[in-house]
């Protein structure tokens, strides 16, 4: 809105002045760094505003929105002047100690839709063989049900998607398909 834009413009001008004239070196440095961040954000937004159509509709949930932004950056890679990039996208809500039977299918559906749209956008750009998407997590889940969900465990399932992925294999040791064994959490 105009009020916010006006306030940001005033803050920007104040920081620019502080970066040039503040008495303390740390004040000048902080102001200069913040002005550089403002400038980079303006350029970033301008480039993304001109990004080509991805040819696929992404969902508007957090995963879909983030993956769409990554796809637009990749589509605009020449304008950004970079050949190799690593992006981190966050997907939250998987700590399902309770209500797992109703929440987990929705989470999986969102992840599936986001990864599918992202993969299709890479195919539409003709670069599916040059882009790899991988999942990672800091914890896994137990196989045993706690009555309404699962608790923290030793590992979890991860996957890798991309045209260059040589799929069809499982990596790591598969625990016995039973409870109360030495590898059970």
PLM features: what roles do these ranges have?
Residues 139-169:
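Histidine-centered active-site microenvironments of extracellular/periplasmic hydrolases
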Residues 85-87, 129-135, 154-157:
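Structural beta-strand/beta-sheet cores of well-ordered domains, especially the beta-sheet scaffolds
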Residues 81, 126-129, 150-154, 163-165, ...:
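A structural signal for short secondary-structure junctions
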Residues 1-112, 117-124, 160, 169-185:
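Feature for exported/extracytoplasmic and membrane-associated proteins, marking the mature portion
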Residues 122-147:
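Metal-dependent active-site segment of extracytoplasmic phospho-/sulfohydrolases and closely related
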